[in-house]
Amino acid sequence: DETNRSLLSVIDDSRLRLPDDLDIAPDGRIFFSEATIRYEMSEWAVDALEGRGNGRLICHDPRTGSTRTILRGLIFPNGVTICRDGQSLLFAETWACRISRYWFDGPDKGKREIFLDNLPGYPDNLNRGSDGTYWIALLGMRTRTFDLAMRKPGFRRRMAKRIAADEWLFPNINRGCVLRVSETGEIIDALWDEAGENHPSITSTCEHKGWLYPVS
């Protein structure tokens, strides 16, 4: 999966359709997510309803100019952050409601495992705090109705064909939440805006010198 067509081209898709988040490894390699190779940002809801692994994780090495896909078949991969060990990273899959860990160096190179699963909402960006814990922004909370729809592909197909797009079921993105998670995947704390009045749809949060900065 390498090509020299341009710095940010990969062989299985000459154009980056929806790059999302990135982080830089200690050796300068850039790891970034492409949320979907099928849809534009304005069509995010279609990707959510499709529920397929249309996304991928990509590595660009400035030293060689190569760009390659390292993981594919991901369900709207979103936030990416390098772990403290400098050999692995965490990435969010928004519609799968999970965080995974991938080792790009070291003895476990190429290994992928679930870090945090069955989250109560849809993870967006994630960042490592000054104490080594991770801050995960949930852009919205899951509902039983949408969860049920995601288990029924036939229902989703009929809905898309017979109902106007502005009346489709959508993920709930009107309630903000931020999770603080340990290096082992244990949820330490959760900050909520249950009414969605002050910080609805939190997409990212960063900690700096003890202060937390949410973005919505």
Kindly label every feature range from the protein language model.
Residues 1-216:
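Sequence-structural signature of mature extracellular/luminal beta-sheet repeat domains
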